Regions:
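Exposed, low-structure sequence patches enriched in small/polar residues
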Residues: 1-374
Length: 374
């Protein structure tokens, strides 16, 4: 047999709670299958979502504080040991009796029997909470607040996973991710210097020529991620090596219509991204793991505002689109439409190897540019 259930609780417009549960016995199988998988499985998940801004005064109507939490558990209990026809409960009973015959206490024998049972089971427990798309929405109608703080969007999430399986006695992984983005649409600041040339031959074709002094939009972002994985294999006496991740990526872009209704009317799109690693900050000079407080002291206000580690990759892209407009002689512009695009890409990578010979062999920078007309 197999069972599945779910329930949902809505808390008006404040949030919701959703829970799901499923369970199946070892012999359950679908109609198109002849046998079950001989594994008893249980799954449980609960999801919570809320909007914390609903508790703020009405003046903070532009504030966004979404929050979510998820807890999930999966438990698999096989009837037989992996890749064999040995019944797990029978093997546990044999181990218990063997320990009793050796003179062990019932508690010690039961501990050995439980180890036999646990070794064949798979247990996964996951937790995650997140706040994504956070906007402060400070209720001050002044450009210094409206165009700075209120244009910032932030997000943070944390997740952790515990696992026990026939392969690992335990594996624990945690990770957090933080991002902050600032985007701004700039008001047009332009001039039209040829409005007087309506009756002038040739030049009059560009009477609506406009020069823009500011980009139309600009955005920048910072993305940081840190995580760690530790595990103990059932086939090794010592724990496996700690897997660490600590990286940052910063990026920016803008789009700028330099001119409009002119001879070329170029539109410049520029973006760059730089990736760096902060993994060297994880360990001190003696190879010991630094605490979060020690790492933060190395990152902030330590000779500079923020230390984002060693740069390992950098990319820049420039795209210029233009639409040539020729003087309107004899109405030819009605039949002519020309476009062009110029692109330039720059890429730089540094393997961050301590061996200079290896570092210099792998480190490289490339520049590619193309021009097309139609």
């Amino acid at each position: 047999w197999s069972a599945l259930g779910s329930a949902e609780l809505k808390l008006a417009d404040v949030g919701s709670i959703i829970g799901t549960f499923s369970k199946s016995n070892p012999n359950f199988h679908r109609l198109e299958e002849r046998f079950g998988n001989r594994v008893a499985s249980t799954n449980f998940t609960i999801q919570m979502q809320g909007a914390l801004e609903k508790f703020l005064p009405k003046e903070f109507k532009e504030t966004k504080l979404p929050i979510s939490y998820t807890h999930a558990e999966t438990f698999e209990k096989p009837v037989y040991e992996a890749q064999s026809d040995i019944n797990v409960e029978s093997a546990a009973a044999v181990a218990y009796n063997s320990e009793i015959q050796k003179g062990s206490t019932p508690e010690q024998a039961q501990s050995v029997a439980n180890a036999v049972t646990n070794r064949s089971q798979t247990l996964t427990v996951q937790d995650q909470w997140a706040m994504t798309g956070v906007k402060l929405g400070v209720p001050i109608n002044h450009w210094a607040i409206r165009e700075t703080i209120n244009k910032v969007t932030m997000g943070y999430d944390y997740s952790q996973t515990f696992e026990r399986s026939p392969v690992v006695a335990e594996r624990f992984k945690w990770q957090w991710h933080f991002n902050i983005t600032y985007g701004l649409n700039l008001p047009p600041v332009s001039i039209e210097p040829l409005t007087w040339s309506d009756k002038v031959p040739i030049i009059g074709s560009y009477k609506a020529w406009k020069i823009n002094f500011l980009p139309s939009n600009f955005s920048t972002s910072l993305d940081m991620r840190r995580g760690r994985t530790t595990e103990q294999s059932r086939f090794l006496q010592t724990p496996g090596p700690v897997i660490r991740e600590f990286a940052a990526q910063r990026a920016a872009q803008f789009s700028w219509k330099l001119t409009e209704n002119g001879f070329l009317s170029p539109v410049v799109d520029y973006n760059y991204s730089t990736g760096s690693t902060l993994a060297p900050l994880e360990m001190d000079e003696f190879g010991r793991q630094r605490t979060g407080n020690e790492i933060s002291k190395l990152m902030f206000l330590n000779g500079k505002l923020i230390n984002l580690g060693d740069d390992g990759v950098h990319n820049q892209n420039v795209t210029i689109n233009f639409r040539p407009k020729f003087p309107d002689l004899f109405g030819l512009n009605t039949y002519l439409e020309n476009t062009g695009v110029y692109t330039a890409k720059y890429e730089w990578r540094n393997p961050l190897q301590p061996d200079t010979a290896l570092r210099d062999a792998v480190q490289y920078g490339t520049v590619n540019s193309t021009l097309s007309l139609s």
